[in-house]
């Protein structure tokens, strides 16, 4: 078995950083503990979204469509996250820290795995803002594109709601871009602390996508959760081999697409494609930003945009 153990009698145990991200994403989404059933079972969920409604009009003409908030029913599959840890009696006797470290990492690994699923749902956002530069304006536009009631007049209320997941490299860029605005703020001068930008709380997430920032409120994603973690153990007495399993049933889902926006570093340009490229994402103008759309035939003549 491929464990690396200490052969010394006197042990010093140093555990490397096991977390993909130190952020517990369950605090950033709604948690519904009513999940029942087993892995593979289906659950239907209402997903709210917004349609685009911006048109170019001639004089005297009116809009032929309106921006609408609607929901569609999507079918999700209940997920089972499980891991396994095996060790021999002789390994535990040689290195007493083997089992505690192994069992601790089982919990860490489940944490990382569920976190990854939650973040994946946030990344399904179909609202976007193009930002040539990460600055105050980019986050202000993101908040303006979300379907929340508080904007200009109650910024302190927005700051209790909105958050952003930012890659460390993008946080560094944001610090540089805000340096002039924050040069008289003591905490920024001493530590580079940014905190809140345009009512959005900034959270560094080391495995977030570089160049794409997720801005959202908790209502965007729901974690349907079956409470508790199941633990099962088994032992082969003849071989002195021990096995521990830990498992969790859960289901993360984007339940309100109007409450999450992607800030994409880059410029929005009108598409020059004359045919649809399946590998590309096309956008329509939506408020101060854009919304993912699907061209019928010709992205260029249908006024679709690309961001990058």
Predicted regions and their residues:
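Glycine/small-residue-rich hydrophobic helix-like segments
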Residues: 191-236
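Extended, solvent-exposed, turn-rich assembly/linker loops in the middle of proteins
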Residues: 124-195
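Long, contiguous amphipathic alpha-helices that act as assembly "spine/axial" helices in icosahedral shell
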Residues: 45, 68-127, 164, 236-248, ...
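Short, intrinsically disordered N-terminal pre-domain segments
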Residues: 1-23, 270-274, 278-280, 286-288, ...
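Extended, compositionally biased alpha-helical segments that mediate assembly or anchoring
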Residues: 233-272
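Cell-envelope/extracellular anchoring and linker segments
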Residues: 116, 120, 132-148, 159, ...
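Short helix/loop capping segments that flank catalytic or ligand/cofactor-binding pockets
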Residues: 53-56, 173-176, 253-255
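N-terminal "assembly arms/tails" that initiate or stabilize quaternary assembly
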Residues: 1-71, 238
